[in-house]
Curated annotation (Swiss-Prot):
PANTHER family: TRIGGER FACTOR CHAPERONE AND PEPTIDYL-PROLYL CIS/TRANS ISOMERASE (PTHR30560), TRIGGER FACTOR-LIKE PROTEIN TIG, CHLOROPLASTIC (PTHR30560:SF3). One of its GO terms (cellular component) is cytoplasm. SUPFAM superfamilies: FKBP-like (SSF54534), Triger factor/SurA peptide-binding domain-like (SSF109998), Trigger factor ribosome-binding domain (SSF102735). Keywords: Cell cycle, Cell division, Chaperone, Cytoplasm, Isomerase, Rotamase. InterPro entries: PPIase_dom_sf, PPIase_FKBP_dom, Trig_fac, Trigger_fac_C, Trigger_fac_C_sf, Trigger_fac_ribosome-bd_bac, Trigger_fac_ribosome-bd_sf, Trigger_fact/SurA_dom_sf. It is an enzyme of class 5 (isomerase). It catalyses: [protein]-peptidylproline (omega=180) = [protein]-peptidylproline (omega=0). One of its GO terms (biological process) is cell division. This is Trigger factor. Belongs to the FKBP-type PPIase family. Tig subfamily.
Length: 440
């Protein structure tokens, strides 16, 4: 075997490998003989078919099988011999096979970059200092009351923001109805901003059974090209107005939650505080991790293999489709939509792997248990959830990876510049929500 490995671009390489004809012909001959021992052909007993007939019938496929095996085997040897760190799937470029002549083929592939972590002491992290106080508990209680609210029809009062309304509407532009502009028994909570600007405000002040028109202009950024910036008229028939009623915080209200019988309001508040503290702890850890990783990447920018980016794009597209009811649309989105995030994730993976390898980090079983318990606490039966995870190898691998990543983050934080920033619970959780929404 003769080998020439050359760099074609950044992390891309090409291996040109020449295989000796004697080795190929011997392997083909051995395979023909082996095939003849078990071959069946009309007019011959099993294993008694002449070699020349075997070659006529199976020779080409045997030759192809041998060449494929040789190409893969000798490329694997090349990778070991040249001490190359292969990334992604290699692309084989077969040569032309001529009997009794040496066979030359090429393989195009990528290698992992050589990561040399630097400037770790320049990593900057802003640590949120968040206190959970009684006002935050009160706000959560109010939120829980709203989740349990009931609706009562009010026939004599005009619609207000916060009301739930049921109505028919017909929209038109220049006197012509447009697609999606007509609906019957449409239910909407006023003030949620689900319609074009001015629509909900146009209903406020009207009473049940009224029929009226509102004139609106579609936003310039509206998704339908034919309606962008167009003035439209909506004929509305208001059929029902409902106002919400919040439950009192009493024994009946407490029964809605998974608490022991005859629990007090104080017990409910304590449970709420515990759950909020758990979510807060997770959110703070997540924020610190995000900042650490962002700073690490900014200080250690490097080229990453395109093949790994392509694999990550596929993974992101599949994940996005699994969470959407518009799977076909997501599958048709251009790959460029996912490219930036995919490249970032690949870089993060490479850098954290280097931190883990350099520091010889191993999984802390206690951390694994903590992660498991945090996940399980969000479910109705935590013990069953933990058992479910422990019996699922894929899920447990994810937990182990999270625990290992956490070990890497802690190593990075030892040398990082950390500044503390006091912030209210509500403001911090708002920031977390906005960040999560932007990343979706």
């Amino acid at each position: 075997m003769q080998v020439l490995v050359e760099t074609t671009e950044d992390l891309k390489k090409r291996a040109t490998i020449t295989l000796f004809s004697d080795d190929i012909e011997k392997a083909i001959k051995d395979k023909v003989v082996k095939t003849a021992k078990t071959a069946k052909m009309d007019g011959f007993r099993k294993g008694k078919v002449p070699i020349n007939l075997i070659e006529q019938r199976y020779g080409e496929s045997i030759q192809q099988d041998i060449l494929i095996d040789f190409m893969q085997d000798h490329f694997s040897k090349t990778i070991l011999q040249e001490k190359l760190n292969l990334a992604g799937r290699p692309q084989y470029l077969p040569g032309k096979y001529i009997k009794n002549e040496n066979y030359t083929y090429s393989v195009e592939f990528e290698v992992y970059p050589e990561i040399k972590l630097k400037d770790l002491e320049l990593i900057e992290v802003e640590k949120p200092i968040v206190s959970l106080n009684d006002d935050d508990i009160d706000k959560m209680l109010e939120k829980l009351r709203h989740q349990k609210k009931t609706w009562q029809e009010i026939p004599d009062l005009p619609a207000e923001m916060g009301d739930r309304v049921t109505f028919d509407f017909t929209g038109s532009v220049d006197g012509e109805k447009f697609e999606g502009g007509t609906a019957s028994d449409f239910v909407m909570n006023l003030g949620e901003g689900n319609m074009i600007p001015g629509f909900e405000e146009g209903i406020v002040g009207h009473k049940m059974s009224e029929e009226f028109n509102i004139t609106l202009t579609f936003p310039d950024e509206y998704h339908s090209e034919s309606l962008k910036g167009k003035e439209s008229q909506f004929l509305i028939h208001l059929k029902k107005i409902e106002k919400f009623q919040l439950p009192e915080i009493n024994e009946e209200f407490i029964k809605n939650f998974d608490l022991p019988e005859e629990s007090s309001i104080e017990a409910l508040r304590a449970e709420i505080r515990k759950n909020m503290q758990r979510e807060l702890t997770k959110a703070i850890r997540k924020r610190i991790k995000e900042q650490t990783i962002t700073s690490l990447c900014d200080l250690n920018k490097t080229k990453v293999p395109l093949s790994l980016i392509e694999e990550e794009i596929d993974a992101l597209r599949t994940k996005a489709a699994s969470y959407s009811d518009k799977k076909d649309i997501i599958k048709e989105l251009p790959r460029s939509v996912f490219a930036e995030k995919a490249e970032s994730r690949v870089l993060v993976g490479l850098l954290l792997t280097e931190v883990i390898d350099r520091n010889k980090l191993t999984v802390d079983e206690n951390k694994v248990q903590v992660f498991l318990e945090e996940i399980a606490e969000a479910y109705e039966n935590p013990k069953e959830t933990i058992e479910f995870y422990k019996n699922n190898k894929k899920l447990m691998n994810n937990i182990y990876n999270l625990a290992l990543e956490e070990e890497a983050i802690q190593v990075l934080l030892k040398n990082a510049k950390i500044t503390e920033k006091p912030i209210s619970f509500s403001e911090f959780m708002k920031q977390i929500h906005e960040t999560d929404t932007a990343n979706d």
